């Protein structure tokens, strides 16, 4: 029974993280990469934000 409960908790945690990532607007200095099917973020033109920082974020379709 403990294993089933632990699996449920882990599954819910991963689901919450997935939902949070999908609905996150890109950080300041980043913009949504419309060419990417994963809707990742990229640095805005002239921004000094690292590409790695932007790529760590996902953007919701409405922000693209």
UniProtKB/Swiss-Prot annotation:
Contains 3 disulfide bonds. Keywords: Disulfide bond, Neurotoxin, Secreted, Signal, Toxin. GO terms for cellular component: extracellular region. Expressed by the venom gland. It is found in: Secreted. Residues 1-24 form the signal peptide. The keyword RNA-binding does not apply. Disulfide bonds: none annotated. GO terms for molecular function: toxin activity. The keyword Secreted applies. Belongs to the scolopendra neurotoxin 6 family. This is Putative neurotoxin 6. The lineage of its organism: Eukaryota, Metazoa, Ecdysozoa, Arthropoda, Myriapoda.
């Amino acid at each position: 029974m403990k294993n089933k409960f632990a699996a449920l908790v882990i599954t819910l945690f991963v689901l919450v993280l997935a939902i949070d990532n999908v609905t996150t607007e890109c950080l300041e200095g980043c913009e949504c990469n419309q060419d990417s099917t994963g809707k990742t973020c990229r640095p805005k033109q002239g921004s000094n934000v690292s590409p790695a920082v932007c790529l760590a974020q996902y953007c919701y379709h409405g922000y693209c």
